[in-house]
């Protein structure tokens, strides 16, 4: 009979055994075609939950220069597999109109006051240009959480219905970190290979289009695909640059 310490050790052994088995099916010296990489991560997935499919992209930019910060939004053709809660902050006279957009909540100053009180219950906040002065009162609260409405991300708009629809259907916000990397969840392991591949292509395409004019040399330096618990698979960059999109 195993004692409790042995049981814990056995659990750790099972996990590490699964990782070793998964890693054994990946050639670390090889860069994989996108479709083959999607197939591999599905094959080696061992977690007992619906893992997120993650992508990590190393960019040839210097984020310490504001002109080389890469940021944007990519619509995921296959969705993200997540339920996104959306809040719309608008003028009082627009409340009835925007309540038909499909947002989870539509309000005005009441939502701003709720945020001030620490009630931040939504994944995306959308507002109109006319409300930006009022919304700026909570910029220090929403900003560090990546929730502040931003014209560059499309979340400051008069076309609220279209943006709510886009957000609800699935999109990924991306921003390069201090090390020059972009990390994003682009779907679930339960997605088909076609669905994962479509989302990868959509995200990388959006990142290529967001290349700063000041960034010189190689833009895409490495792309890795993985799941929440699994090892990473390196992708062949030429899959995305054959048309010359990498360089401007």
From Swiss-Prot:
One of its GO terms (molecular function) is structural constituent of ribosome. It comes from the Bacteria. It holds the Pfam family Ribosomal_L1. Belongs to the universal ribosomal protein uL1 family. PANTHER family: 54S RIBOSOMAL PROTEIN L1, MITOCHONDRIAL (PTHR36427), LARGE RIBOSOMAL SUBUNIT PROTEIN UL1M (PTHR36427:SF3). Part of the 50S ribosomal subunit. This is Large ribosomal subunit protein uL1. The lineage of its organism: Bacteria, Pseudomonadati, Pseudomonadota, Alphaproteobacteria, Rickettsiales. The gene is rplA.
């Amino acid at each position: 009979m195993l004692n409790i310490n042995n049981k814990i050790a056995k659990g750790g052994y099972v996990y590490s055994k699964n990782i070793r088995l998964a890693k054994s099916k990946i050639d670390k010296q090889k860069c994989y075609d996108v479709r083959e990489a999607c197939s591999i991560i599905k094959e080696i997935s061992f977690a007992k939950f619906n893992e997120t499919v993650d992508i990590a992209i190393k960019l040839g930019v210097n984020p310490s220069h504001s002109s080389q910060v890469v940021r944007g939004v990519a619509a995921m053709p296959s969705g993200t597999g997540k339920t996104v809660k959306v809040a719309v902050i608008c003028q009082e006279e627009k409340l009835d109109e925007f309540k038909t957009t499909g947002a989870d909540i539509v309000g005005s100053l009441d939502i701003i006051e709720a945020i001030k009180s620490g009630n931040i219950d939504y994944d995306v906040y959308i507002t109109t240009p006319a409300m930006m002065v009022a919304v700026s009162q909570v910029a220090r609260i929403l900003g560090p959480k990546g929730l502040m409405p931003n014209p560059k991300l499309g979340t400051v708009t008069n076309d609220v219905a279209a943006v709510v629809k886009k957000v609800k259907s699935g999109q990924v916000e991306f921003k390069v970190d201090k090390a020059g990397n972009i990390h994003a969840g682009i779907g679930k392991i339960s997605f088909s290979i076609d669905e994962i591949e479509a989302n990868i292509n959509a995200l990388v395409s959006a990142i290529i289009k967001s290349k700063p004019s000041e960034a010189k040399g190689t833009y895409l330096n490495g792309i890795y695909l993985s799941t929440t618990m699994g090892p990473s698979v390196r992708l062949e960059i030429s899959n995305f640059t054959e048309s010359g999109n990498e360089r401007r």
